[in-house]
Design a protein with these regions (language model features):
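Phosphate/pyrophosphate-binding loop motifs in nucleotide- or prenyl diphosphate-using proteins
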Residues: 1-218
Length: 218
């Protein structure tokens, strides 16, 4: 009979058990949480689409586009989870973290960042527009997704820096820089909060022209 594992540990791979507060478990938990929030937001969008029937087709088109973009983001997070678990490279991204052929919402990783930093130019949304409850439920959930993606990135940095330090025999707490493992995953995660911000700005621009300083069409 196999020995019963302690309550404070959890199985993760064929390598055995780790504690539930291990960076690996924290990363996977943050990634799982972000996926769950995307699905919640998609459910809300389904309800919004039902309410939009018979109204201006522009509204329905905008909501459907956002629904599709969220599905692309969800699929990407699932690909990241699979890539981390299997050790396989992330599709479209070079192992050294360079962009490769990767696209999200039709944009490269660098374009996602550029659109986020220049939202007024691309979407007519004034720089540093702060989230507000008057922007609606969907926008609030997009902002929540943005913050959760930051948490995923933070957890990933700790995990992959620690893994690299262990592999190289370096002290993880030392000041000497350690090149992290899985730079492909880290590079993508570094751009995903920008991707969520792009969705936020586009959503406001399309459905709240009173906030946008310039017109933007689907």
């Amino acid at each position: 009979m196999s020995e019963k594992k302690a309550y404070e540990t959890v199985a993760h791979t064929g390598d055995g058990y780790v504690r539930k507060d291990d960076p690996l478990i924290l990363f996977r938990g943050a990634l799982d949480h972000a996926q769950a929030e995307i699905i919640v937001t998609q459910t809300i969008l389904d309800q919004e689409l039902q309410l939009a029937r018979g109204l201006d087709p522009y509204i329905g088109n905008s909501l459907r586009r956002l629904q599709n973009d969220l599905q692309d983001l969800l699929d990407l997070l699932r690909d990241i989870m699979t890539a981390e678990y299997t050790g396989e490279p992330l599709k479209g991204v070079e192992p050294d973290g360079s962009g490769g052929t990767f696209r999200l919402f039709g944009l490269t990783l660098d374009e996602l960042q550029e659109h986020s930093h220049n939202a007024e130019e691309h979407y007519g949304i004034p720089t540093m527009t702060r989230p507000d409850h008057t922007f609606g439920e969907v926008y609030a959930h997009l902002n929540l997704i943005r913050t959760e993606l930051r948490q995923v990135e933070t957890a990933a940095v700790r995990l992959f820096l620690q893994n690299a330090a262990v592999s190289s025999g370096e002290d993880f707490a030392a000041e000497a820089p350690v090149v992290p493992d899985r730079r492909d995953i880290l590079y993508v995660l570094n751009r995903l909060s920008s991707a969520a911000h792009v969705l936020m700005c586009r959503h406001l621009s399309e459905l709240r022209p009173d906030i946008a300083g310039a017109s933007y069409t689907v």
